[in-house]
Amino acid sequence: MGSRALVHLAVGLVGLFGLRPAELAVLRVDDEGRLRVGEVKRNRWAMRRAKSERLAVGIDIPGRDGEGRRILQLYASGLVKLPLRILTTIERGEFKPVGEAFRKLLERYPFWQSLATANPGLTPYSLRHGYAWRGHKAYERSLSVRDLAALMGHTPAVHLQHYGKWTDEAGLIDAVERLTTDPLTALVAP
């Protein structure tokens, strides 16, 4: 299996399922074929409750229908594994280094290098932000903050603080136009 396919699997899991890169270490497919994600963040809030798993559901990139299902099937089949650098880091049992291994792996690939050059500030975590954006903006109907926060493994407050930065005037007008039949862009200034 070529290394490109292995990286594609890792990028697909992080980007299409909204994972923290470190969560590549705590994935499993349950008996119903759903992706489950263990905990990697153990902050004060998380320490007060038992470790649990959350459901991760893919949100496809528009025009790439079924890609999340395909990535999940590849992962579940075991025919395509995560890249060796990530697997050996997972074996050490620490989570943060898994995210670092993912970042270093991406930085070696020309496709990521060209994306990063064209989009200053792009990081591996941007794949997770893209998931949040698609859940709220890419489709005619959007997921609620509460639902998307649960899928991403954080609270609605954290979601609003860190994943709502793309709100701008044009986006607000578009959102209202999708909700109503009033074309706000046709308004004429007095």
What are these regions (language model features)?
Residues D60-L115:
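Major-groove DNA-contacting interfaces characterized by cationic-aromatic clusters
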Residues M1-A25:
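Basic, Lys/Arg- and aromatic-enriched nucleic-acid-binding interface segment
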Residues V26-L74:
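Conserved tyrosine-mediated DNA breakage-rejoining catalytic core shared by Y-recombinases
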Residues A175-T185:
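Short, basic, alpha-helical segments at the C-terminal edge of helix-turn-helix-like DNA-binding modules
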Residues V26-E32, A138, D147-T155, H162-K165:
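A short, basic/aromatic helix-end/turn motif that makes direct DNA contacts
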Residues S3-R4, F17, F95-A150, A157:
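Short, basic (Lys/Arg/His-rich) helix/loop patches that form interaction surfaces
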